[in-house]
A protein has these predicted regions:
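Mid/C-terminal beta-alpha module of Rossmann-like enzyme folds, strongest
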Residues: 1, 179-213
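Conserved Rossmann-fold NAD(P)-dependent oxidoreductase catalytic core, especially the SDR/UDP-sugar
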Residues: 8, 60-61, 66-136
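Residues in the short beta-alpha loop(s) of Rossmann-like NAD(P)-binding domains
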Residues: 15-16, 195
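NAD(P)H-binding glycine-rich loop region in Rossmannoid oxidoreductase-like domains
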Residues: 16-21, 25-87, 98-102
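Residue-level signal for the nucleotide or nucleotide-sugar donor/cofactor binding architecture
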Residues: 39, 72, 164-167, 197
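Flexible, glycine-rich beta-alpha linker
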Residues: 104-107, 127-148, 162-163, 170, ...
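A conserved pocket-lining segment of Rossmann-fold NAD(P)-dependent short-chain dehydrogenase/reductase
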Residues: 147-167, 171-192
């Protein structure tokens, strides 16, 4: 979306080799891949130097020792927003999650809510986008469970009645592009699809699509 509108894009990734496919979405030299980690506060100013807008997409569904909810959703978000403010970046867009709240019983959504607060403390005019479960060709959620189903005779379904409104990745990208293009600030956008599904229903749809029972 942004590349098609002529923007030059700098993407910070831990392993640029795994993100080489992103370059095909722009012209030669339009999309730059930089090896880095948003959790490393001291390096952030160099990553965003000269940028007109910073978009924070860093997130995880599943915690690991090196990628905890606190480190990624709260600390990294705070550090990036702080670096953007100090670097006089004009616009900051933070990707959160639908249902994010510091009071949530879900550790994921709680960390997302606290991450929003951390961003706004450092960059008060930040835009907050709260998408529901995002699906697309390389999404984390569905691809992870698809891989699990291929190696396991069963899939554990915890919280099977939890409801989602899956939203297509292109629709989220269009919303982000619109904020950048119109230079909007202090906007809160909740994004969800037209249909509501339980977690169990989503898993059953997934199994049907990959021809598993």
């Amino acid at each position: 979306q942004l590349a098609n509108k002529g923007y030059f894009i700098r993407v910070i990734v831990r392993n640029p080799n795994e993100a080489l496919f992103l370059r095909i979405y722009g012209k030669v030299g339009q999309i730059e891949l930089i090896s880095g980690d948003v959790k490393e506060e001291n390096n952030l100013p160099a990553y965003i130097n000269g940028s007109g807008c910073v978009i924070n997409c860093a997130a995880t569904f599943f915690e690991t020792p090196s990628q905890s909810f606190k480190n990624l959703h709260i600390n990294a978000a705070r550090n990036l927003a702080k670096a953007a403010k100090e670097g006089q970046v004009g616009q900051f867009i933070h990707i959160s999650s639908l249902g994010a709240s510091p009071k949530s019983d879900s550790q994921l959504l709680k960390s997302k809510g606290e991450g929003e607060q951390a961003v706004l403390e450092c960059f008060p005019k930040a835009n907050i986008i709260r998408p529901s479960l995002i699906f697309g060709s390389e999404d984390t959620f569905f691809n992870r469970f698809a891989r699990l189903s291929s190696i396991s005779p069963f899939i554990p379904v915890v919280g099977s009645c939890t409801k989602f409104q899956p939203v297509y990745v292109d629709d989220v990208a269009k919303a982000i592009s619109s904020l950048v293009e119109d230079d909007q600030h202090e906007r809160y956008l909740d994004l969800g699809g037209d249909e509501t599904y339980t977690f169990k229903e989503l898993i059953l749809i997934l199994l049907s699509e990959i021809k598993r029972k």
